[in-house]
């Protein structure tokens, strides 16, 4: 099962929940579709794209926080409140977590923290 059919919870240091309702986009179609067509993300919602080192907000209707992760899940960069019609790239990244704008600051996500996705049954 791939794409939006798969749900994950993303945990940070000390097991704290960073994204409670996160969709996994790990196929070419689900990664290309991303958050297109949505009106927004609520706190606790997100999209984990992998593999990915670059994302764009073209055709989107809302700003997002973008968390870039390396191969081991360590945060390498955070781009906050990226508005529509922008692009963000971090060549060291191997995955990207998209969150509602303001969530990265609220959660105090910083480079060096390790994030770990866990599969959710059902």
Question: Where are these predicted regions, by residue range?
Answer:
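Compact, glycine-rich, soluble single-domain proteins
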Residues: 1-122
